[in-house]
A protein has these predicted regions:
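Internal gly/pro-rich beta-alpha loop/helix module
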Residues: 134-249
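Helical hairpin unit composed of two closely spaced alpha helices linked by a short loop
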Residues: 292, 297-300, 343
Length: 345
């Protein structure tokens, strides 16, 4: 079957160029205009995905070819993007890339953002850090275009622009060398008003002003980026071919699986929780920083996170820790990973 999914990939030349800032701002700004936005993050990253979830108001899905395979990645985009209800403001899937456009696990570029964009036949918008450069920006953009002509490179967003002359010089160079539209220019001063350093480094739940940061980011992006042009580019993406999703029979609820989800343990992929429910589990969410005791459950899932930053809060619940230890010693099945494994250990 073929599915229509308006979509675009926001990519960069490297880490720290402003991809997450732009992606979070675009997602929230479009949402505030009435557009139905479904966010995706290339790769396994939890933190960027959490900020995108906060911006969109719905879970962000990770698209990782290495972990899930190409077919599952396409299926995820179709399952969560093609079913978007029609709205007056339209609908769009926004996919944030990772690292540089062509950076991957090996020298072939497989698993790169470029590989993902080709797999999904998605237009690519390149965000470029313009700090202390002018015409060189155009040469870097041209290099990306020439490295892989199969890419649907559709435009550029300039980040950290110093002044009007700086912007004009770069726009002129890109027009001369690249024949690509500049879709926006984010001033260095405007971006500095938002704690950009936290985006991608700190989970929203640990950020004292997460909502204010997302709102401020959206305001900057809405003022300096052509959102209508982004939607038009996303709408040019061709339909995607994918098999019909298999029907999953409803499984009777047969067990209670505790999931420790709080400020210390927050690294969960929604697909894993959905898979547990599909197999008949009733999920019981637990907060190790607030609950006095572990509730009655048949199994326990403790995901990753940053328990070291919440050590005081975890230590303030000795009764919870004792009840967990007693349950484990009594044979409770526990699956723990990353920070969860550290806590249990």
């Amino acid at each position: 079957m073929r599915f229509d999914v308006p979509r675009l990939v926001l990519a960069g030349l490297g880490g720290g160029c402003g991809k997450t800032f732009l992606a979070v701002g675009v997602v929230r700004a479009l949402r505030e205009r009435g557009t139905r936005v479904v966010p995706f993050k290339k790769g396994p990253d939890y933190i960027d995905a959490a900020w995108l979830s906060r911006a969109a108001g719905i879970p962000c899905r990770n698209l990782d070819v290495h972990l899930a395979g190409e077919a599952a990645v396409v299926r995820s985009l179709v399952d969560h993007g093609a079913g978007m209800p029609k709205r007056a403001g339209g609908s769009v899937a926004v996919i944030e890339g990772a690292r540089g456009l062509f950076d991957a696990m090996d020298e072939t570029g497989k698993t790169s953002t470029a590989h993902l964009a080709r797999l999904l036949s998605s237009p690519v918008v390149l965000v470029v850090d313009c700090t202390k450069v002018t015409r060189t920006v155009a040469s870097m953009v041209l290099g990306c275009r020439m490295t892989d002509r199969r890419l649907r490179l559709a435009g550029v967003v300039l980040n950290r622009i110093g002044n009007a002359r700086h912007e004009a010089n770069i726009r002129s160079a890109i027009a001369d060398l690249c024949d690509l539209p500049v879709l926006g220019a984010l001033p260095r001063a405007a971006a500095a008003a938002v704690p950009e350093r936290h985006l991608g480094l700190v989970m929203p739940d640990e950020h004292a002003a997460a909502e204010e940061s997302v709102a401020a980011t959206a305001e900057v992006v809405a003022r300096h980026v052509d959102l209508d042009a982004l939607l038009e580019i996303a709408g040019r993406a061709p339909s995607l071919s994918a098999p019909r999703a298999p029907r999953t029979p409803r499984t009777p609820r047969t067990c209670r699986v505790g999931v420790v989800r709080d400020s210390a343990f927050s690294f969960y992929y929604p697909e894993n929780l959905e898979a547990l429910e599909a197999e008949g589990a009733t999920l019981v969410f637990v907060d190790a920083t607030r609950d006095e005791l572990l509730p009655e459950v048949d199994a326990l899932y403790i995901g990753g996170g940053f328990p070291e930053t919440q050590a005081d809060r975890l230590a303030s619940r000795p009764g919870f820790a004792r009840s967990l230890r007693a349950a484990v010693e009594d044979g409770l099945p526990v699956y723990a990973e990353c920070g969860g494994a550290v806590y249990v250990g």
